[in-house]
Swiss-Prot record:
<keyword id="KW-0689">Ribosomal protein</keyword>
<dbReference type="InterPro" id="IPR018102">
    <property type="entry name" value="Ribosomal_uS11_CS"/>
</dbReference>
<comment type="subunit">
    <text>Part of the 30S ribosomal subunit.</text>
</comment>
<keyword id="KW-0687">Ribonucleoprotein</keyword>
<feature type="region of interest" description="Disordered">
    <location>
        <begin position="116"/>
        <end position="137"/>
    </location>
</feature>
<dbReference type="GO" id="GO:0005840">
    <property type="term" value="C:ribosome"/>
</dbReference>
<protein>
    <recommendedName>
        <fullName>Small ribosomal subunit protein uS11</fullName>
    </recommendedName>
</protein>
<dbReference type="InterPro" id="IPR036967">
    <property type="entry name" value="Ribosomal_uS11_sf"/>
</dbReference>
<keyword id="KW-0694">RNA-binding</keyword>
<keyword id="KW-0699">rRNA-binding</keyword>
<dbReference type="InterPro" id="IPR019961">
    <property type="entry name" value="Ribosomal_uS11_archaeal"/>
</dbReference>
<dbReference type="GO" id="GO:0019843">
    <property type="term" value="F:rRNA binding"/>
</dbReference>
<dbReference type="GO" id="GO:0006412">
    <property type="term" value="P:translation"/>
</dbReference>
<comment type="similarity">
    <text>Belongs to the universal ribosomal protein uS11 family.</text>
</comment>
<dbReference type="GO" id="GO:1990904">
    <property type="term" value="C:ribonucleoprotein complex"/>
</dbReference>
<comment type="function">
    <text>Located on the platform of the 30S subunit.</text>
</comment>
<dbReference type="InterPro" id="IPR001971">
    <property type="entry name" value="Ribosomal_uS11"/>
</dbReference>
Amino acid sequence: MSEEQVNIKKKEKWGIAHIYSSFNNTIIHITDITGAETISRWSGGMVVKADRDEPSPYAAMLAARRAAEEALEKGIVGVHIRVRAPGGSKSKTPGPGAQAAIRALARAGLKIGRVEDVTPIPHDGTRPKGGRRGRRV
């Protein structure tokens, strides 16, 4: 490899895309590789008008596209993705927007590195809501 190619590789700036997806909303937060500095932050509620549309895959796609555009402007070429559901005593599965957000980030031109699930899992934490016999449907 020549010196020019080495310099190009060094200048590639990567970030982390934190995708928090619940059944009420989807939040896409792109940070630098350390996670300390915010580069872009968008949510489903920022891109659609109706409250009922916030958790939809469409809203997640729009939010992810806007976040990716901002990140590309600031020089980010690729992201590692960290998907998170509410977790704890709440739902441990990501909402409907998580998949759509990942796809939208890839389509927007960002390289995708690792995809990992960082949902908090309780090691015998608080008691789940619903009482002794659970929610009766």
